[in-house]
Amino acid sequence: MKSINAYTDGSCLGNPGPGGWAVLLRYKNNEKELVGGELDTTNNRMELMAAIMALERLSEPCQIKLHTDSQYVRQGITEWMSGWVRRGWKTAAGDPVKNRDLWERLCAATQRHMVEWCWVKAHNGDSDNERVDVLARGQAMAQRSTVASR
């Protein structure tokens, strides 16, 4: 089973507003960047999309160390999801879980991989985290330009 390091980040200008996500996948000396964006989204949705794309783009089951600066993503998948599912996708307060569509997609994407969820502090000198931050922000800005040109 291949060992992959993934760095993910999401960005949103306005929250809600134009947003972008970015992934850096590293296997041995090989790297691949993945990016995308949406016209009207939130930061949390872009953080989730980055993690989803990191996992979905792997063509075979892998051991993956997924680095995110989003506690929302890390805690959601490692701590909160089992309770949400048990309560029929309701929070502990009884409210519907936000971004359920993406949480379900992320859960499905994890099934064929061995994932270690690693939190990294944002804007704290981690060069790979900074790299995906710049890429995600660039995608959000590109989406904003698309909106402005309409």
From Swiss-Prot:
Domain of life: Bacteria
Coiled coil region boundaries: none
BP GO annotations: DNA replication, removal of RNA primer
Cellular location(s): Cytoplasm
EC annotation from Swiss-Prot or TrEMBL: 3.1.26.4
Alphabetized Pfam families for the sequence: RNase_H
InterPro entries registered for this protein in UniProt: RNase_H, RNaseH-like_sf, RNaseH_domain, RNaseH_sf, RNaseHI
Domain RNase H type-1 positions: 1-141
Required cofactor names: Mg(2+)
Cofactor: binding details: Binds 1 Mg(2+) ion per subunit. May bind a second metal ion at a regulatory site, or after substrate binding.
SUPFAM superfamilies recorded: Ribonuclease H-like (SSF53098)
GO molecular function: magnesium ion binding; nucleic acid binding; RNA-DNA hybrid ribonuclease activity
Residue numbers binding Mg(2+) 2: 9, 133
Catalytic activity: Endonucleolytic cleavage to 5'-phosphomonoester
Binding residue positions for Mg(2+) 1: 9, 47, 69
Physiological role: Endonuclease that specifically degrades the RNA of RNA-DNA hybrids.
Family of the protein in this entry: Belongs to the RNase H family.
Subunit structure: Monomer.
Protein name per its UniProtKB record: Ribonuclease HI
Lineage: Bacteria, Pseudomonadati, Pseudomonadota, Gammaproteobacteria, Lysobacterales
